[in-house]
Amino acid sequence: MNIFRISADMSHLLAIIILLLKIWKSRSCSGISARSQILFALVFTARYLDLFSTYISLYNTTMKITFLAATYATVYLMFFKFRSTYMRESDTFRVELLIVPAAILALLINHDFAPFELLWTFSIYLEAVAILPQLFLLQSTGSAEVITAHYLFALGSYRALYIFNWIYRYYTEDYFDPIVVVAGIVQTVLYADFFYLYVTRVVQTRKGMELPI
């Protein structure tokens, strides 16, 4: 049993649950970037298109279905049920600046040119930067609700824990994938400043988080 991978997946699942509960209970998606959520939906769609053709384990299949369903549910809530609360004017990050480079990188740096492999590689690259619209939105508004901060911390922890998973697999299985490791490090670095602000302004004060603009 790889405790690091399970912990990472549980942290990821916790992040998604926090986000869905935040939106549903408050009846609002204020402070949440729909553009980031669309990118995450694209990430999981590209990564899990092999859902019905490749079976690894019940755990793996269950997590795939859960992440897909939860992400699309979030997008639905933001664009339909609670669309009037979506901060469209502030959520302006140009996602094509992330999607196009990720697609080009997937074509240039990959393990194989098989369709599913290219889609998987694209999803790894895109996931590394998919949080940028959310961080950009926080920077634009200058603050984050406590529950939104908890969501982002859990999401960042998921990727940080996966770094320990890769270290564990390297020493126990002699497994090393430079694509996922480099992308994971980039993603973790993007969260670094947020982690610091989370600890100093949310955990210690138990209040919302004001960001320097």
From Swiss-Prot:
Q: Give the UniProt record's GO annotations in the biological process aspect.
A: protein retention in ER lumen; protein transport; vesicle-mediated transport
Which UniProt keyword terms apply here? Endoplasmic reticulum, ER-Golgi transport, Membrane, Protein transport, Receptor, Transmembrane, Transmembrane helix, Transport
InterPro entries named in the record: ER_ret_rcpt
Tell me where the signal peptide lies. Answer: none
An example of a Gene Ontology cellular component annotation for this protein is: endoplasmic reticulum membrane
Annotated membrane-spanning segments are: 3-21, 36-53, 62-80, 97-110, 118-137, 150-168, 179-199
What topology in the membrane does the UniProt record assign? Multi-pass membrane protein
* Cytoplasmic compartment segments: 22-35, 81-96, 138-149, 200-213
Which domain of life does the UniProt lineage start with? Eukaryota
Please list the residue ranges that the record places on the Lumenal side of the membrane: 1-2, 54-61, 111-117, 169-178
Any one GO MF term held by the record is: ER retention sequence binding
Q: Name one Pfam family in it.
A: ER_lumen_recept
List localization entries.
Endoplasmic reticulum membrane
Question: What family does this chain come from, according to its entry?
Answer: Belongs to the ERD2 family.
Protein task: Required for the retention of luminal endoplasmic reticulum proteins. Determines the specificity of the luminal ER protein retention system. Also required for normal vesicular traffic through the Golgi.
List the protein's name.
ER lumen protein-retaining receptor erd-2.2
Native organism is Caenorhabditis elegans
